[in-house]
């Protein structure tokens, strides 16, 4: 299995620290609001990668943190006249609702920064003792010049970073690129006692500490969105390797942006949709199919048209599943026949192709294409003359290849059928109201989803295109 390592900028063979196990740390949300669908892409991508590792037999220790103390959280809590903890509790609860809605598996652990304050303070103290950090009037800064490899993840050296830095001048810093790992107490902010006075941690130190506490000095994979490469992950590396003297993570993985009109979706640009808003309009499997239709390192444009296309694709896949489910009641032969054995080998080749695509840096786009090729083959060659065993194997294979992607796992077609019936009722009403444009639109939309309507004297009938 090969994956692209941001650190080396190339694909590398994955070799875990411990055979059969993967330790994985993914930077989670700052819990001051609902997460937008751009963040959702990141969480969904690494959920899929975790699922695929498990499909290939690995035990995955998957850690995703909650940043529950932060400038944005303090500002929002003060605006609402509640405590930062109350705000964090609320939006952690809302995070789980939306992540569950996207069919994202629960992490092995979701540490909260505020639960690790003793460990964070010790981490800061160790950096000061080793000469990598210094205290000024209750603030503690990491000295980037002391860490000779600073910039290695983002591919920049310290001189270039300083030249291009847009950093406000702070006379207390020894160097403009030094960053705060502890911030002194300010009015209206939560604070904790420490040897250099009351205060709170900086964002970067929180992740370094939680990753170390839960996964050890060196972890297999550290991951997050592409926007975290610099400064967040760069600073994590500096802190962790300065303190522990060991490689922090063997592989760094980053997912590309979800764009709107070719611009990164972000709260700062106010060009975002919350995950909850999208879940109100689309099923989780449709969203997953859309998100995974592009490679995780490729920017993806977000649009209703693309989601509608994913919805139609999802229904075509479920049409195939529905056809196979019906065939189970119609076939007359139980066991695979001699003539079918060669065809079973043909079906098995799709699984091999799927694994080949996913083993190549988790190429979900190509893996989904393999599933569609498999379904087309099955639709063409399996019918009432096939054996029950072959139909069952075909059905199991489609679902098996869908599982690591978090799709094609629904047990029945009932929900889909009910939706189709509802649309037909709406079309009938439109015809009664002589709203021919709406009636034609519903018919055309259904046709695009593989559903053909037949107007008969007995009423409207529908069938799925083969």
UniProtKB/Swiss-Prot annotation:
HAMAP family: Cys_tRNA_synth. Belongs to the class-I aminoacyl-tRNA synthetase family. Its EC number is 6.1.1.16. The gene is cysS. It comes from Clostridium novyi (strain NT). CDD domains: Anticodon_Ia_Cys (cd07963), CysRS_core (cd00672). A motif ('HIGH' region) lies at residues 29-39. Signal peptide: none annotated. It catalyses: tRNA(Cys) + L-cysteine + ATP = L-cysteinyl-tRNA(Cys) + AMP + diphosphate. ATP binds at residue 267. A motif ('KMSKS' region) lies at residues 264-268. GO terms for biological process: cysteinyl-tRNA aminoacylation. GO terms for molecular function: ATP binding; cysteine-tRNA ligase activity; zinc ion binding. One of its GO terms (cellular component) is cytosol. Binds 1 zinc ion per subunit. This is Cysteine--tRNA ligase. Its main location: cytoplasm. InterPro entries: Cys-tRNA-ligase (IPR015803), Cys-tRNA-synt_Ia_DALR (IPR015273), Cys-tRNA/MSH_ligase (IPR024909), CysS_C (IPR056411), Rossmann-like_a/b/a_fold (IPR014729), tRNA-synt_1_cat_dom (IPR032678), tRNAsynth_Ia_anticodon-bd (IPR009080). SUPFAM superfamilies: Anticodon-binding domain of a subclass of class I aminoacyl-tRNA synthetases, Nucleotidylyl transferase. Its cofactor is Zn(2+). It is found in: Cytoplasm. Zn(2+) binds at residues 27, 207, 232, 236.
């Amino acid at each position: 299995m090969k994956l692209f390592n941001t650190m080396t900028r190339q694909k590398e063979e994955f070799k875990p620290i411990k055979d059969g196990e993967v330790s994985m740390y993914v930077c989670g949300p700052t819990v001051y609001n609902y997460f937008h669908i751009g963040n959702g892409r990141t969480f969904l991508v690494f959920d899929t990668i975790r699922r695929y590792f498990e499909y290939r037999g690995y035990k995955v220790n998957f850690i995703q943190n909650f940043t529950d103390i932060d400038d944005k959280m303090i500002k929002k809590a003060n605006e609402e006249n509640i405590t930062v903890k109350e705000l964090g509790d609320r939006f952690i609860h809302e995070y789980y609702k939306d992540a569950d809605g996207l069919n994202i598996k629960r992490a092995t652990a979701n540490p909260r920064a505020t639960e690790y304050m003793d460990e964070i303070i010790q981490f800061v103290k160790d950096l000061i003792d080793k000469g990598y950090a210094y205290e000024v009037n209750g603030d503690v800064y990491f000295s980037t010049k002391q860490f000779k490899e600073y910039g290695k993840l983002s591919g920049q050296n310290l001189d270039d970073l300083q030249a291009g830095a847009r950093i406000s001048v702070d006379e207390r810093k020894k160097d403009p690129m030094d960053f705060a790992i502890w911030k002194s107490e300010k009015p209206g902010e939560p604070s904790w006692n420490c040897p250099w006075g009351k205060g709170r941690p900086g964002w970067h130190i929180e992740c370094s500490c939680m990753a170390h506490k839960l996964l050890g000095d060196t972890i297999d994979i550290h991951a997050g969105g592409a926007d975290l490469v610099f400064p967040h992950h760069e600073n994590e590396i500096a802190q962790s390797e300065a303190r522990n003297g060991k490689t922090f993570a063997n592989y760094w993985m980053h997912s590309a942006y979800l764009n709107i009109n070719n611009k990164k979706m972000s709260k700062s640009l106010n060009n975002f949709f919350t995950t909850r808003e999208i879940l109100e309009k689309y099923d989780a499997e449709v969203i997953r199919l859309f998100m995974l239709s592009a490679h995780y390192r490729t920017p993806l444009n977000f649009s209703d048209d693309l989601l509608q296309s994913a919805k139609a694709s999802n229904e075509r896949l479920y049409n195939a599943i529905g056809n196979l489910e019906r065939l189970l009641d119609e076939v007359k032969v139980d066991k695979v026949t001699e003539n079918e054995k060669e065809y079973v080998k043909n079906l098995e080749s799709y699984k091999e192709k799927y694994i080949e695509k996913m083993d190549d840096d988790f190429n979900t786009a190509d893996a989904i294409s393999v599933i569609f090729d498999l379904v087309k083959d099955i639709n063409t060659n399996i019918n009432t003359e096939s054996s029950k065993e072959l139909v069952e194997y075909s059905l199991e294979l489609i679902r098996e290849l869908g599982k690591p992607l978090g799709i094609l796992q629904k047990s029945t077609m009932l929900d889909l059928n009910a939706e189709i019936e509802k649309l037909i009722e709406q079309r009938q009403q439109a015809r009664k109201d002589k709203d021919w444009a709406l009636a034609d639109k519903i018919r055309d939309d259904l046709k695009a989803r593989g559903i053909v309507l037949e107007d008969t004297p007995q009423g409207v009938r529908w069938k799925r295109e083969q």
